């Protein structure tokens, strides 16, 4: 007992080391989450489009949905590391926000189980029982879309300490609600962008005629992302500084170049997307991830530092009682328990 400590505030690495690990692990997790969401959304939309008799058999829709299995497995597995790192680095804010979000937070697991089972059933029934496929697909994708709503809400609340008391009183502030909605829509838009890009390069080899539709989805989703991103930036204006502004600027520039490459007047191959997308989309993804990391660290690091300072003050208050506590603790350690008298005094005597 050489120091008074709090296990939740101890960190196995330096803050910078944890930030680096969080950036890498969360980036990988988010990438596969976006691919998984985009695949589920596009698979359902293409299936419903074909149901109207526009494109004949559902072979390509089934091909899109079949890739969901591997993507969802990677998304779930890669999500463990960033979740654990956030619990260690920002324990006070994390456990407070998830406690306030407790019912929704606990619903994540059953929602994921239901979504994955329904989407698998959707893929297996789309050619045999179309009505059952519609039922499973709509419910499965709906359940899947609820999960990022919960996560973005919890993260938004975690980063806004001033909203904790109001949220506990069931008072959802207009600013917080708007930021939550914009953040959620931005995630869904990103899922369309990266899902369409993924299948543009990896699912059109045997169906080159589908590339045009995926290019259109990619163009439209990127344009919508820019529109949503403008008010989203204003919703975090308090935390803006030059590193964040620089990262956002790089991301916007990359998005504009993506639109230029994909513009309807641009020449294109029906077999695949422009190779420049293989550079522009990673730049767009990393730059926005950098901006998010800076914003999160700016808002959460002071909360952790305040908790550490409170622990140190508490340690000073308890310091005069340290010797007394150690004496009582040492007396207990010196007690011999392998005799009948001690066992009787400690266990039997209170009742007999």
Residue ranges and their predicted role:
Residues 21-26, 58-70, 125-145, 212-218, ...:
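Alpha-helical transmembrane segments and their helix-start/interface "positive-inside/aromatic belt" motifs
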Residues 69-137, 228-255:
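Membrane-interface helix-loop-helix modules in multi-pass inner-membrane proteins
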Residues 32-44, 105-121, 185-201, 249-263:
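Hydrophobic cores of alpha-helical transmembrane segments in multi-pass inner/ER membrane proteins
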Residues 126-243, 247:
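Long, contiguous internal "core" modules enriched in hydrophobic/ aromatic residues
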Residues 1-26, 56-60, 82-103, 154-182, ...:
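Membrane-interface interhelical loops and short amphipathic "cap" helices
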Residues 311-343:
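Electrostatic cytochrome c docking/interface patches
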Residues 342-352:
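C-type cytochrome heme c attachment motif
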Residues 267-297:
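Internal/C-terminal transmembrane anchor helices
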């Amino acid at each position: 007992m050489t120091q008074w400590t709090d296990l939740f505030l101890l960190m196995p690495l330096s803050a910078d080391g944890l930030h680096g690990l969080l950036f890498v692990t969360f980036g990988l997790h988010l990438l596969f989450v976006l691919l998984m969401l985009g695949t589920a959304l596009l698979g359902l939309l293409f299936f419903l489009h074909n149901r109207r008799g526009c494109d004949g058999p559902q072979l390509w829709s089934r091909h899109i949905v079949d890739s969901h299995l591997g993507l969802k497995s990677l998304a779930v597995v890669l999500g463990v590391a960033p979740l654990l790192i956030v619990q260690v680095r920002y324990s006070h804010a994390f456990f407070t926000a998830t406690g306030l979000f407790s019912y929704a937070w606990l619903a994540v697991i059953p929602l994921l189980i239901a979504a994955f089972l329904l989407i698998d059933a959707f893929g297996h029934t789309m050619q045999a029982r179309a009505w059952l496929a519609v039922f499973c697909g709509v419910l499965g994708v709906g359940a899947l879309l609820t999960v990022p709503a919960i996560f973005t809400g919890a993260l938004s609340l975690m980063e806004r300490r001033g909203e904790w008391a109001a949220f506990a009183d069931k008072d959802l502030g207009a600013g917080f609600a708007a930021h939550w909605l914009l953040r959620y829509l931005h995630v869904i838009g990103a899922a369309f962008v990266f899902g369409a890009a993924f299948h543009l390069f990896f699912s059109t080899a045997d169906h080159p005629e589908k590339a045009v539709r995926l290019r259109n989805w990619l163009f439209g989703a990127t344009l919508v992302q820019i529109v949503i991103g403008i008010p989203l930036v204003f919703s975090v204006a308090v935390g803006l500084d030059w590193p964040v502004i620089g990262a956002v600027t790089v991301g916007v520039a990359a998005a504009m170049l993506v639109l230029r490459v994909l513009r309807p007047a641009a020449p294109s191959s029906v077999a695949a997307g422009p190779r420049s997308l293989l550079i522009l989309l990673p730049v767009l993804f990393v730059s926005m991830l950098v901006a998010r990391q800076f914003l999160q660290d700016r808002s959460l690091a002071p909360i952790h530092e305040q908790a550490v300072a409170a622990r140190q003050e508490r340690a000073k208050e308890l310091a005069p009682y340290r010797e007394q506590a150690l004496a009582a603790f040492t007396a207990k350690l010196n007690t011999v328990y392998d005799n009948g008298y001690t066992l009787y005094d400690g266990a039997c005597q209170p009742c007999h």
